[in-house]
């Protein structure tokens, strides 16, 4: 499959199955937002370095976002044909990760957390927005 059409886009793009939709279609907007998050998570993975305790979690989240994006880009009539599945129930996985991080944080927090501190922290704040 080529990544270009040589025909100009005329404000349209393809989704799974070859259907043409407007570039301002909610599915394209949603996937653009998910792709931005995925890119920031990738940047965080590079910044923290190999072997960091967050690597596995961030990689899981990136893979999961790609699966979600594939479903967003699949028309309802073709959803059953999409072979992409999440590796684990995302709510269970995320709750386990939240519990892990909550155990490391001293509660109750009485202050707002200002974005920044260091580059990784700042990128984590960008990801959450």
Where are these regions (language model features)?
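Phosphate/pyrophosphate-binding loop motifs in nucleotide- or prenyl diphosphate-using proteins
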Residues: 1-129
């Amino acid at each position: 499959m080529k990544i270009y059409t040589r025909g100009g886009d005329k404000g349209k793009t393809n989704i799974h199955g070859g259907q043409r939709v407007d570039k301002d279609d909610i599915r394209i907007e949603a996937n653009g937002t998910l792709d931005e998050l995925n890119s920031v998570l990738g940047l965080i993975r590079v910044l923290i370095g190999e072997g960091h305790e967050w690597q596995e979690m961030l990689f899981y989240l990136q893979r999961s976002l790609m699966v979600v994006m594939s479903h967003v880009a699949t028309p309802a009539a073709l959803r059953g044909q999409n072979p992409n599945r999440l590796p684990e129930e995302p709510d269970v996985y995320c709750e386990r990760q939240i519990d892990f991080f909550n155990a490391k944080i001293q509660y109750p927090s009485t202050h707002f957390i200002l974005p920044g501190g260091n580059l990784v922290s700042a990128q984590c704040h960008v990801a959450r927005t």
